[in-house]
Amino acid sequence: MVMYARKQPRLGDGCTDRRDSQPYQTLKYSSKSHPDHRHEKMRDSNDATPPCKMLRRSDSPDNKHMDNTGHGRAKAIHPHRGREREGGTSISPQENSHNHSSLHSSNSHSNPNKSSDTPFEPADDWSEHISSSGKKYYYNCRTEVSQWEKPKEWLEREQRQKEATKTAAVVNSFPKDRDYRREAMQATPASYSSTKSSIATEKPSSLTPSSSSAAVSGLDVPNSASSASGSTVPVSPVMQSPAPPTLLQDPSLLRQLLLALQTALQLNNASVDMAKINEVLTAAVTQASLQSILHKILTAGPSAFNITTLLSQATQLSNQVAQQSSQSPMSLTSDASSPRSYVSPRISTPQTNTASLKPPLSTTPVSSQTKINAMTVKSSSLPPPSSQQPLSTEKHHDNGNSPRTLQRQSSQRSPSPGPNHMGSNSSSSSNNGGGGGGQGPGVVSGAMPPGSVPPGTAPGRATCSFTPTLAAHFNENLIKHVQGWPAEHVEKQASRLREEAHTMGSIYMSENCTELKNLRSLVRVCEIQATLREQRILFLRQQIKELEKLKNQNSFMV
């Protein structure tokens, strides 16, 4: 259906328009403007309606952007559109937006809301209008065709814009008006320089090739030489300085760091009151409080704990876990799609699932073996690794402040966090194993080749974490009989039975439906037959009356 736009009459300026048959107001074709329109533009600039939705000529984007040399600019835009038409589809939307901005950059009356209010591009001929009945319609200025539906080109352009804004929002995850690096460096006291080595152990010293998606996944990695703007910073393969601010913006990373620091402090024994740290951790809900707590812990100085001893202890503990678990031939691995864990005999270095999820609330020194058993061993859901890295290469890589020790610390010996953050440690171990397909939003990846995981972190599904009150009443021995293969078997049986019941029920229902339809049709047939009989009876009665009349007439005549 072709519908031409009707021109609404302008109010009281007495100027008639020569192009009444083409009333579209778009950015494409400039119309000659009356000088009074500049004053109307000043009055209408307070109107919150976007200019593309209005049908008054004084509100059209052309007149909003028309200066004294309006005719010259109209002439400049026409050959520009002609060039674009000759170019055809070879002009990319980026080039179009660049040309459009370069055409309008010299304008002194530019509207700041124009880029967000007017979704036009110079390459598109469709424009949006409101008809007299109030419905939106779309008008093509080249073919002079109007239609109600959105045209294909319009939908494609909207899709492109959505994708562009989505990628821009993900890459530029921090607001541009704040400089987090400068704020964090101002908020950090002078004693922070003494603990720079401790932070360096918790920051990745090198990034794997697959970690270039870290900037896309919300973790901007700033160079030390980058300017203090919020724009995206290219990810360098090796970081030149330990930069804490980006680390302090990610809530999941903050929680993992806090848990790692907590277990580190507990391993180093009784220099800090662990009950207070636990209280603070459960109370720290917001990201700002987490940042302040982490600043306090980090700037407490190396007197509170010694990072090098922690690294050696972490390596020894992972070695112990690997040796202890290699005695049993099975391991707990997990299906990436299901939340349950099952026993798999495929992997030689198993994962020990432990008995208690209660967070440590005491500072009494316990042996490292019982500490391993007292906390949950958590790791992200990874496919079975193609090659396990031996411990000697692990130690060789660890002397460069590699973050895998931090990952092992936070994944092996971390107590369960508070109720507001369920299973955050599942994202702490690095996610670049085969088939991983990029990284999660809080993943610090170490210098590991893809497909290999550190020893001691065999892929096991992260169990859901409990609040301390729930963890006190949790006993894993009571659910062991439905864990692993039995649970898998029972779930498969249950799903099969559910599907069978569903199909049988649907079959029965369809049979009943067809039977009911058949009976209903029979009832309808009976009704039709009854009406036919009634019609026959009425017809016969009428004939009987006529015959009686004829009989009476005959008797009179005789």
Curated annotation (Swiss-Prot):
InterPro entries: WAC (IPR038867), WW_dom (IPR001202), WW_dom_sf (IPR036020). The keyword Coiled coil applies. GO terms for biological process: chromatin remodeling; DNA damage response; mitotic G1 DNA damage checkpoint signaling; positive regulation of DNA-templated transcription; positive regulation of TORC1 signaling; regulation of autophagy. Keywords: Chromatin regulator, Coiled coil, Nucleus, Transcription, Transcription regulation. One of its GO terms (cellular component) is nucleus. Residues 432-443 have a biased composition (Gly residues). Residues 22-32, 188-200, 223-234, 321-378 have a biased composition (Polar residues). Acts as a linker between gene transcription and histone H2B monoubiquitination at 'Lys-120' (H2BK120ub1). Positive regulator of amino acid starvation-induced autophagy. Positively regulates MTOR activity. May negatively regulate the ubiquitin proteasome pathway. This is WW domain-containing adapter protein with coiled-coil. It comes from Danio rerio (Zebrafish).
